[in-house]
Regions:
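Start-transfer (signal-anchor) and selected internal transmembrane alpha helices
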Residues: 1-25, 110-123, 203
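Extracytoplasmic catalytic/substrate-binding loops of multi-pass membrane glycan-assembly enzymes
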Residues: 30-42, 52-64, 78
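Aromatic- and kink-enriched transmembrane "portal" helix at the membrane-lumen/periplasm boundary
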Residues: 28, 73-77, 81, 109-114, ...
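Transmembrane-helix motifs of polytopic, lipid-linked glycan transferases
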Residues: 16, 82-111, 153-157, 203
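Loop-to-helix entry region of an early transmembrane alpha helix in multi-pass inner-membrane enzymes
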Residues: 58, 70-93, 97-98, 114, ...
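Membrane-interface alpha helices of multi-pass inner-membrane proteins
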Residues: 45-48, 124-125, 173-187
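Membrane-interface transmembrane helices that cradle and orient dolichyl/undecaprenyl
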Residues: 108-115, 154-173, 181, 201-202
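Transmembrane-helix signature of polytopic, membrane-embedded enzymes
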Residues: 13, 95-130, 165-169
């Protein structure tokens, strides 16, 4: 029990380290104001609580409006842009936890492979953190950063549910998954791609 508690503490500590490390890089390279493509539209509609292009992104706009109220800069675009580095860094921390879950399922978990498991997950998460697509969306006001976080969160909760499905509280994970998928449609429809993964978890795991 004590060993497992130590491993959990190490795991969550590394996730926090990943969050702050990637946030520092994303914030350092963040767009200081409005950038290209849809960002100007999202910033403007967040500020006035307007309606962007279909199918709309109401949850993203509400969060953007909240960040626009923070008195951290005179530039509204800068305030709203800050949300993307935060949520993108959180996605990387979640990815680290997801990788650990996958490795546990692929290999029998022993004390000897803890370093290998955490090391592999840490490197994999950092590698993804600085891929072009993720980094590009982590530095401007776009829906993809938050959508990626919601998708990762649904995947992580699905894995936790499958791991604890024999326990009495497993239904809580399913309720959270369904609720988050509903919220995610107010950001982007990307989250619907998790449905096949959830279905496979129901059948196979």
């Amino acid at each position: 029990m004590m060993i497992q508690k130590i491993k959990n503490n190490v795991e969550y500590t590394l996730a926090v380290v990943l969050f702050f490390l990637t946030f520092f890089v994303y914030f350092s390279t963040m767009a200081p104001t409005v950038s290209f493509w849809d960002t100007g539209e999202f910033i403007a509609t967040s500020y006035i609580l307007g309606v962007p292009h279909p199918p709309g992104n109401p949850l993203f706009l509400l969060i953007g409006k909240l960040f626009s109220l923070f008195p951290i800069s005179s530039d509204i675009a800068f305030r709203i842009n800050i949300f993307s580095p935060i949520i993108s860094a959180a996605t990387i921390a979640l990815l680290f936890l997801i990788c650990n879950q996958f490795i546990e399922r692929l290999n029998s978990y022993t004390t000897d492979n803890s370093i290998l498991k955490f090391g592999s997950s840490f490197i994999a998460s950092l590698t993804f953190a600085f891929t072009h697509s993720h980094w590009f969306n982590a530095v401007e006001a776009e829906v993809y950063a938050l959508s990626g976080f919601m998708t990762a969160l649904v995947v992580y909760l699905t894995m936790l549910w499958s791991k604890n499905r024999q326990k009495s509280y497993h239904i809580i994970y399913l309720i959270m998954i369904v609720y988050l998928m509903g919220l995610a449609t107010g950001i982007h429809l990307l989250n619907l791609l998790t449905i096949p993964f959830i279905a496979l978890s129901l059948i196979h795991i």
